[in-house]
Amino acid sequence: QFGLVGSEMCIRDRDIAMSGDFIVGFSGETDRDFAETLQLVNQVGYASAYSFKYSPRPGTPAATIEQQVPEHVKAERLESLQQLLNAQQFAFNKATEGQIVDVLVERIGGRAGQMAGRSPYMQAVNFVGDQSQIGQIVPCKLSAARQNSMSGEIIAIKGAA
């Protein structure tokens, strides 16, 4: 049902972007369970997601389940899921190129003169700026999509004279 609700929300309101966390290879996960996960991801379409392999923790009930998923199967499933999620994330980023969004400036970026922040869709956005902007919201035009981030350009600073 979540898949239907999630995809319907995105159809009705284009400003909604879905994000999720996925664990593959949980104790007892079958091929069918994993196929249903992929079907859900295809149905919803995620703007961003985190995905991991399950690792048993001593002392937890799941660690004692007899049907543990072999490590190589977990790795294959994670690779398949991440390929799908990465393609969806890049497609979402590509679709937002050219949009003007408010970006919350979080920190100094990885390159000289660069700042880094987050769009309302939680996309990482890198742009030319300065440290005084940390903590501020600045309007940015999203100019180039990358797999895990966007490049942007400040178009004006709110409240500037």
Predicted segments, located by residue:
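Secondary-structure transition/capping motifs at alpha-helix termini
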Residues: 12-16, 43-46
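Single conserved hydrophobic/aromatic residue that forms the stacking wall/gate
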Residues: 1-6, 10-11
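Terminal RNA-binding accessory module
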Residues: 64-161
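Conserved strand-turn element in the central/C-terminal portion of the radical SAM core barrel
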Residues: 14-33, 52-70
